[in-house]
């Protein structure tokens, strides 16, 4: 901290620590030391002494003193009360450069009152200055420099002192602490003693003194007017000239000369022994022809004492031209040709650099020799020549020419296209190093004339533009000297060239510097199965690879599952994901990696099928085969059992349409024009019709074994035929003898004769009152007859005076019960009521159907016997009384006499039997 700032801070503290009642008063106390400076790392103790007047005014003592550093209270452990007026504070290992230390007292209700304050500084004492040196600049005062040592962190004064043996020179106060220039001109050839003194608040120290002659510390002024000239006789020399002062000739100086080419950064030193003697000119030799050089020069006392002058200003010059030092690099390319006898050959060469051209190249001379006697010469100003050559062997030579002369010829053998190259380099490698692309190889066993290196950028969007360079036969490692780009793939080819022609070529790919791919691969599914998927992708275009693709990574996951990653070699373009779940959506992302990083491609999704390929077929085909086999077995079984099946499903039912019963009804006109006696009864049978009046009596219950309708018991006793089951139930078809007025027919009729049909006519025909028809359910599967399908054809004609009555035709009607035992649960009375409630047409139809059934399906001998026995047992005699008794025996009520229909029973008997009445 500077002195003005310290005094300002102290003045501020003074005003803060004095009481003011219209005037300034003395402070209450003081701090000792008042200006403390402490060496860093040491201990320091400060003392605060209170005045007696302050003690009495504020009613305090030393125990009320509070120490603060930078407005922070000092811990009580560091404070010591010496007596009632004195308190001390101790600091250990002081490290802060500056500390504001104040002494305060607590008065009037613990109010802090500042008493006094000081600024405590810390630092180091000055080190002893070292390395004291002095330089006498030509024409200027002497400048001395030294090393002050470590930083003191305090204000330190450095003073340069000098004296002769008998005289002291004025001191030089250093402003920077490291150097000082004296205010007087030194005297040469008289020794002077010089030293440095350093002083601050913590101490004072002096350097070692040096004693010297100022002339030995002289630093000359730089040479000037430096010029460079060349020589036409010698293209490898340049002449230099300059001017140096040397204290106006009082000093002998030697020179130091350096040079470099214009584009170089490194200077070349001229040997010092060549310039030991004082001079103002010099000739530099062994330079390259037609090359621009830059020179500089400096001087020093010839004895070597003192200091080198600063470098002079640079000067440049160009050597004279010379013939080219070496032939150009020479190579050829064969262009595609449509002819078979000639070929197009493009001869190419590199322009010589200035260091080898030794001048300006005017043109190139190309000589093509097919044989020793045949040659062609071409003069070309460019760097290529295209010629048409035969398929013979040629030798081409190339020479560059400037105004001084021609270079040596470069010879290249162009073999016949039928010759095959035999040798090539081996172990070809390429690698980047120091921002250069290096190529290394092993030479072939045959001696080589030179090597040709070719390279180009591989791209799918642009053609491969080749660049090339030539290397000597002794080289097997070099770097490509073209302008190479990063992240580009270069195809490098090395071809050895022999005296007989070029050998085999070897190629490889390399990058100057790789990077991450510009884009990732696009993956797709080639085949998706139930538990696996074949992924396929295309190679990334070489323009987007930016390096060698080392491997691929495939990341796949489900919508809720964990992501799985697999790594695939870069040579593959397909990969099979296995252990997948069926009927699941998968998200796939693929990345390609080079040596410098990777790049992800777009995300792709696919769904695995629920069933594997062929799995459905494996299920469906056996099921279909099993079904087919079952069907075939069923068909075979049905075929073998067709008779049994037909019996249960399609039984043989008589065709009612072929029945002629309807034509035998006396009340129904025949629907067919035929003679009944001639056609149906050719044997003389005829119809015997009987009219029977039936009286109902229900006083007696029906026996349990009687299940037939009572009306049907009134059939003729003499008949032996059986009622057919057609058109009526089995209960109603029980065989009963009929009542006939002619009793002689009963004995005359044989047991073999049968009733062909019978017709029951209700008594309602007398009253001409039609009744509601009653139908029973039929089990027949045959189609209905015309009269059944069209009931409107049915007619019921009654005559009041007993005229003819036309009844409807019902050739066939079959009920559920086919045997008497089939209806045991229905009472005889209920069945009788059902019959009585029907109209005349119902009974006519029932009997017609019974007769038809008898005609189509006659009973067996046993059935006829049982029927005859039942008929005989039920017969009760003839006459009206007999009729009444038979009716009562079946339980019919006599009170319904008017409701019981009369039976008109036509019967068919053979000749000599019962005749119709």
Swiss-Prot record:
Main localization of the protein described in the UniProt heading: membrane
The keyword Signal is assigned to this record: yes
Cytoplasmic topological segments: 640-917
Chain segments carrying region Disordered: 658-678, 719-754, 898-917
SUPFAM superfamilies: Fibronectin type III
Record's GO cellular component terms: cell body; ciliary neurotrophic factor receptor complex; dendrite; external side of plasma membrane; interleukin-6 receptor complex; membrane raft; neuronal cell body; oncostatin-M receptor complex
Alphabetical GO biological process terms: cell surface receptor signaling pathway via STAT; cytokine-mediated signaling pathway; glycogen metabolic process; interleukin-11-mediated signaling pathway; interleukin-6-mediated signaling pathway; intestinal epithelial cell development; negative regulation of neuron apoptotic process; positive regulation of adaptive immune response
Pfam families named among the record's database cross-references: fn3 (PF00041), IL6Ra-bind (PF09240), Lep_receptor_Ig (PF06328)
Highest taxon listed in the record's lineage: Eukaryota
Comment text on domains: The WSXWS motif appears to be necessary for proper protein folding and thereby efficient intracellular transport and cell-surface receptor binding.
Sequence similarity: Belongs to the type I cytokine receptor family. Type 2 subfamily.
Protein name in the entry: Interleukin-6 receptor subunit beta
Organism per entry: Mus musculus
Gene: Il6st
